[in-house]
Amino acid sequence: MNQVDYLRISLIDRCNFRCQYCMPEGVELDYILKQQLLTNEELLTLIREVFIPVGFNRFRLTGGEPLLRPRVVDLVSAIATLPQTQDLSMTTNGFLLAPMAQNLYNAGLRRINISLDSLDADTFDQIIGNQGRSRWQQVWHGIQAAHSVGFDPLKLNVVVIPGVNDHEILDLAALTIDKQWHVRFIEFMPIGNVDLFGDRGWVSSAELRQQIRDRWGLTESQVRGAGPADVFKIPGAKGTLGFISQMSECFCDRCNRMRLSADGWLRPCLLNETGQIDLKTALRSGTSTAQLQEQVRHLLRMKPEINFKGRDSGIVGTYTRTMSQIGG
């Protein structure tokens, strides 16, 4: 198993979208109250005095939608300037990004992933649960702003939903030809909206790669990320194509991450809540950071056994939160 040195940090569970694959349709979510969220000071204490000492040095800020977090630019700056931070990135839906991109870059953020599940405005609005004025154009402006500012790599995340956006695979892949953008196709998975998954199912990465291979050809890329994506390239393209195959190919043995929820729960596996630790309550009750370090070390030792490997047998993992509440 890889060294676990990568922490995904959910800054907030609220989101200004309601994506089909992330939140169950028609279900009211119990959002975390403000006083239950980790404060910036608590989060920085945990990063400096717990996570870094046990070996974490790469951090990704997620949500909900992380740009809804008050003082998010200040938080980015504080994490980026820690001498032990080797990598700081963010995943966003891009809706609020355009006016914030330069400030985020100036604060030290260099890598960004933006969700772009469709190039068609109507399909996009259907996926994000938008009922009013289309939000596609504002997200596209956010992507263009991130590109202009200099974020590199700039990655576009696509969750492939059968019968909804799977007909756009070639159009989305073509974005990598003329720009140094990295499009990542993510297999739809049964967390966040189990009913939709049951209705729609999923398309394997192998099928997507074959579509692209038949159109342009496809080669393995020399660019290799630190995450679970298998990276390929259209011959002659400036960017790359990543395939995250959590349904068709179990990559538990290469998992290098844990997840910290906005209310302070440290979770060892996306698909399994077993073993998770309530760091916020412990910190607020006076538990020393040395004791918290030991708890995290124990969870790190347990992680290979906790990583969920039951998909092949059709077993569903143990989880009670939606994808938006976990942070993806």
Curated annotation (Swiss-Prot):
One of its GO terms (biological process) is Mo-molybdopterin cofactor biosynthetic process. [4Fe-4S] cluster 1 binds at C15, C19, C22. Its EC number is 4.1.99.22. Binds 2 [4Fe-4S] clusters. Binds 1 [4Fe-4S] cluster coordinated with 3 cysteines and an exchangeable S-adenosyl-L-methionine and 1 [4Fe-4S] cluster coordinated with 3 cysteines and the GTP-derived substrate. S-adenosyl-L-methionine binds at Y21, G64, S115, M189. Its cofactor is [4Fe-4S] cluster. Pathway: Cofactor biosynthesis; molybdopterin biosynthesis. Residues 1-229 form the Radical SAM core domain. It catalyses: GTP + AH2 + S-adenosyl-L-methionine = (8S)-3',8-cyclo-7,8-dihydroguanosine 5'-triphosphate + 5'-deoxyadenosine + L-methionine + A + H(+). [4Fe-4S] cluster 2 binds at C252, C255, C269. CDD domains: Radical_SAM, Twitch_MoaA. GTP binds at R8, R60, T91, K155, R257, M258, R259. It is an enzyme of class 4 (lyase). HAMAP family: MoaA_B. Monomer and homodimer. This is GTP 3',8-cyclase. It comes from Nostoc punctiforme (strain ATCC 29133 / PCC 73102).
